[in-house]
């Protein structure tokens, strides 16, 4: 067993502080959480004081943030990019998660701010590009409905194919409805999203919107807004096992739940910088727990579908992200 002196070096104490704090041990309880190692603990008690541990944890999380935001991305064969906003207290971080052709998930970066802030989201995407991320290939971009985010994606990526998050869409529609009705409508919308084709799903969603438009025009308008983009994965005929991962930003929410779990003892998010450090440390920690996405063997088929989508859009002289063809077909099916 290593002696306590072996842990007195700044690097190892810093690593130990990060490990214990990420395991939800508070600075006050940190010392009691160490394994007993003899009288040397008492002699070196200054190394485990609340302020000393806090300083080491700050340095360790600063290193995790620098590691995350400085990683070389040039070797990633990205097929999908998920972007979402994550709350830490009153602070919001925009988080980017990539899926590569081998099915692995990669935390790519983050920025403090909202998906509604064009400067923030474009800055994050430009940072990914400057670190070597290939933005020239057709890529599935899974996002919420923030216009600033959509605009930034179009500016930075050469051939983005946008999938609007279905979970965000359901929440937005529910926010326009009384609680009881909201739950009923949400169930119907989710059932529509599970239909086997974009054609049938869009026809069903339009029928739901039509039922709502007189009594609840806000909900109807919310459902119709960006409807085709909520069905991009269905239109691309992505295998159902893979589609479950790519039709929403839930993979980011799962990752950030790990961040939140590690930060459960934090009661005062004093700054955006603190939120960035904790979030980055959690993202790096989460990477070690990731499994391949379900249905990853179908990623080559997704890439071919993305390439075909981009080629078809180029032939029509329109961006691939619009997904407009499905809307007219669905209307005909409904008629």
Language model features with spans:
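Inter-helix linker motif
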Residues: 158-175
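Acidic/histidine-rich catalytic cores and adjacent linkers
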Residues: 36, 40, 195-335
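Metal-dependent DNA phosphodiester-chemistry modules and their immediately adjacent helices/loops
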Residues: 173-203, 207
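Positions in alpha-helical segments
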Residues: 15-19, 187, 261
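Short, charged amphipathic recognition helices of the HTH superfamily
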Residues: 24-36
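Conserved pre-catalytic core of RNA-dependent polymerases
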Residues: 12-26
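RNase H-like nuclease fold core
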Residues: 1-7, 12-16, 36-142, 147, ...
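Residue-level signature of catalytic and energy-coupling elements of molecular machines
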Residues: 30, 84, 105, 141, ...
């Amino acid at each position: 067993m290593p002696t306590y002196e072996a842990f007195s070096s700044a690097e190892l104490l810093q690593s130990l502080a990060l490990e214990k704090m990420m395991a939800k041990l508070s600075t006050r309880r940190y010392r009691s959480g160490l394994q007993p190692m003899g009288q040397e603990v008492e002699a070196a008690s200054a190394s485990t004081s609340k302020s000393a541990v806090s300083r080491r944890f700050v340095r360790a999380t600063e290193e995790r943030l620098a590691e995350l935001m400085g990683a070389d991305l040039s070797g990633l064969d990205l097929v999908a990019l998920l972007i979402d906003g994550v709350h830490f207290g009153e602070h919001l971080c925009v988080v980017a998660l990539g899926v590569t052709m081998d099915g692995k998930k990669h935390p790519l970066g983050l920025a403090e701010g909202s998906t509604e802030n064009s400067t923030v989201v474009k800055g994050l995407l430009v940072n990914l590009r400057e670190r070597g991320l290939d933005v020239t290939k057709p890529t599935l971009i899974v996002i919420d409905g923030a216009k600033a985010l959509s605009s930034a994606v179009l500016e930075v990526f050469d051939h983005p194919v946008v999938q609007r998050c279905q979970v965000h869409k359901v929440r937005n529609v529910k926010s326009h409805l009384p609680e009881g009705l909201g739950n009923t409508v949400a169930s119907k919308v989710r059932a529509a999203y599970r239909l086997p084709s974009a054609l049938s799903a869009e026809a069903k969603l339009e029928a739901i919107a039509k039922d709502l438009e007189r009594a609840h025009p806000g909900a109807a308008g919310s459902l119709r807004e960006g409807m085709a983009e909520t069905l991009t994965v269905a239109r691309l005929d992505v295998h159902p096992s893979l589609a479950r991962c790519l039709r929403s930003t839930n993979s980011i929410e799962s990752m950030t739940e790990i961040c939140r779990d590690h930060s459960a003892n934090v009661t005062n998010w004093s700054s955006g910088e603190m939120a960035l450090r904790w979030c980055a440390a959690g993202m790096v920690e989460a990477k070690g727990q990731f499994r391949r996405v379900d249905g990853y063997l179908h990623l080559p088929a997704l890439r071919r579908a993305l390439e075909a989508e981009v080629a078809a859009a180029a032939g029509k002289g329109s961006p691939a992200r619009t997904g407009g063809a499905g809307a007219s077909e669905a209307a005909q099916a409904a008629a």
